[in-house]
Structures are given as structure tokens and as C-alpha cells.
Curated annotation (Swiss-Prot):
GO molecular function: metal ion binding
Any matching Pfam family: eRF1_1
Native source organism of the sequence: Arabidopsis thaliana
Compartments where found: Cytoplasm; Nucleus
Stated name of the protein: Protein PELOTA 1
Gene: PEL1
Amino acid sequence: MKIVRRDFVRNGPGSVKMVAEDSDDLWYAYNLIAVGDSVMAVTFRKVQREIPGGGRDSERVKLKLEVQVEEVDYDKDGSVLRIRGKNILENEHVKIGAFHTLELELKRPFVLRKEMWDSMALDTLKQASDPAASADLAVVLMQEGLAQIFLVGRSVTSSRARIETSIPRKHGPAIAGYESALKKFFENVLQAFVKHVDFSVVRCAVVASPGFTKDQFHRHLLLEAERRQLRPIIENKSRIILVHTNSGYRHSLGEVLHAPNVMNMIKDTKAAKEVKALNDFHNMLSTEPDRACYGPKHVEVANERMAIQTLLITDELFRNSDVKTRKKYVNLVESVKDSGGDAFIFSAMHVSGEQLAQLTGIAALLRFPLPELEDIEM
């Protein structure tokens, strides 16, 4: 996120002018913009005008509007953020109080005003503008006849391509048909790889599968790259990593992120620290269950007893339209940090955030055992 101008008071009012440069930035903006804030941006609106002879005509006019936010919608596939609210900026074409939907797109500046820049909003802003936080990976997740290409960013995991090819059985007289279908499948995956994997953006490309499919495709990829002189692949072949997974389906992305050779490539990033924290939580839950808890009630009680060493929480919980609920979670994060603990805020649109959401979206590693939590209803 490019921050053009900031003018606010911590825990007080103010505004920030910013430009979203990628889909991760739009996700950060989605988490920053809350109901009751105001957003100013250039937009287009169809307006009616009189024409000679008494008729009316309509045209799209470029306007600068500021709306008081009533609803925010994030369209991941279209890379656009839609903000609906009432106009609060005097304009000859749009009355004050009229409803309008602003569409925030990549590379288009906007100004966000808040009455209260709390610690969560400031943390989100800091992460959004930190280039070192990037963890872009390209992942080719495959099994025979199925391949999917994902881009895993700081906060958003997006699907870029899905390739399906019917492959006959390998045995008997069908063997020739098998080999030709497999070659065609690999060729389709190669085309998608060339189109969607940009080594100037991603740290590495992971090819993952059960069995030997990944090795066969990797061999095909490098041979064809040499034959066709595909320079981006030839020059970055050391950044193509192979990982074993149990399937070629999306849920196996978690296995990819936990693989040691992948962790090593992204070890200094926010995403890697979150994956490690989630790993540590699962390990603790299976080895010392009294030192791990999840669910709002259990985590709240653990915090009251100053027992939380590491808090894991999804950003979904901070987007609650009820100000009291948001404040409760903001205070929880601050309380854990004040008592010397760590707090990791997971994106609900990231693989690790999806896994945490299955555990209610909130969990904690404890400094000392709290066996009595078992008796408290979640």
C-alpha cells in the first residue's frame, strides 16, 4: 500500500490518503474501512441533463464524492472494493444524503477518515505499507488429471487457473493413450504456469502433488523451457520447489505452507510467522492440551488470568459492525501485548486464516496449564 499522506491522532480522529497497489492492499483497505467512517474518491455517476428541444439525456460524469460508510464489499476476483453510503460532500450532480457506491480499484487513490484510529487500525496500516511483509508464492497443486495454480500473498490466497484432463488407465493396451493424455495435461499446465507465474513478483514457485506427478511435471517444465528458451523459467529454476502433498485439492495448500523448504524461502515474512504459530498451537494441543485453548470464552478467561503467551485471532472478528464487539477484541490484543505476549492477526482470506477459522477464529498458547477451562462452556 502506498501511503500518500497521513494526518491523524492515535486513538483520535484523522485521515489517510492511500493507493492500493495489489489485491493484498485492497484486503487491508477492507479491514481498515468500518461502518461510520467516510471515504473520498473519484467516481463516475450517470446524470440526467436537459437538451435543446426540451428532451433529457444521460451521461457518465467523473466526480469526487465522499460517502459515509454503511456497507463494504470486497470482490477478490475482480480486485475491487465497493463502498456504499450517503454522500456528504457538496456536489452539483449528487445531493448531500443521496446514496452512492464508490468502487475502489487498484492504482486509484482514496482518502479514509475515521473518528477513532485505534491500535488495530494503526497495526493494519503499518502492515499494509510494509514491503518486507510480502510473502508471494505461486503454487501449482496437482495430481494426475487435475492441476490448480494459486497465488499466496500476505493476506489473500487467490486461484489463478484450474486444469482438468481425462487420463485413461495406465495398464494394458491403453498405455499409449495414457502417455499422450499425460503429455497433453502437462502441456496445458505449462501454458498456465507461463501465464500466471511472474518471478519478478513471487519469491518462489512450488510444484506440489501426491506420488511422482510433481517430479514428472517438473522434468517436463525444465526440458520444455530449454527447448523453447523460456528465459524466466531457465533463469529461476532454483526457485522452483517440489513438495509432497496428500492431494491436488485446495485444502492441501496448508501442507505446502508447512513444508520446511517452503518455510525456509518465506521465513522472514508475516505469513511464515503465522504458519509457525498455528503449527505450535496444534502441537501444544496434542502434547499438552491444558496449555492450549480456543473459542472466545476460553481465551477471555485465559487472558483474565494473564496466561496467554501467544494469541491467534482472525481479522474477521474485528470487522464486526457492533463497535462494542470490535473494541472487545482490540482490547484483548492490547492486553496480551501489554502482559508480554505475542498476538498474530490472521487474514480470513489466507490459507492459515482459513484453518484458524475452523477453530472459531480465536486460539491461544498458554504460559502455564489451565485444566479448569474444560469445565467452562465455550
